[in-house]
Amino acid sequence: IRDLYVTGVQTCALPIYPSAYRFPRGLMERESLEFSFSGLKTSLLYFMDDFKESDSMTKKDVIASYQQAIVDTLVEKMKRAIDKTNVKRCVIAGGVAANKSLRESLRASLPEIQILFPDLSYCTDNAAMISFLGEIKYQSGDYESLDFGVKPNLKLA
């Protein structure tokens, strides 16, 4: 299970029971848009240390439950962001956008919002997309000096 990556989790999780085990949903008690998956990852590691596969719960059930905890968190935080901003259209990109369960849950939970997903062939690691954009900007001469101060608490919006 520790070797699974983005689409590996999705592939293993289908079509099993995503509520077989209740993994934590981090930072849900706060009204903020922040989220953290560190407790979820730790919970899975501890769970798997003691896990014994049985007729009532398989490793696929565990992975499906783990995936559901991630999807639930992302959907809830997205709902909160929509409530705060009143946007009517949103793009979901990066590797996580390839997850079928996330796509379905977002569309079902936010029917009033136009949610756009790139074709699966474009749902890759954000670092690659950012690097590519950086190369395009650099080649076109669109870049800034590297002489600036560090602002660790700089707001994104």
Sequence positions of predicted segments:
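Conserved phosphate-binding/catalytic loops in two-lobed NTP-binding clefts
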Residues: 90, 107-130
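Surface "functional belts" at beta-alpha junctions
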Residues: 97, 114, 155
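Acidic, glycine/GT-rich loop-and beta-edge segments that sit at the periphery of enzyme/chaperone cores
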Residues: 137-157
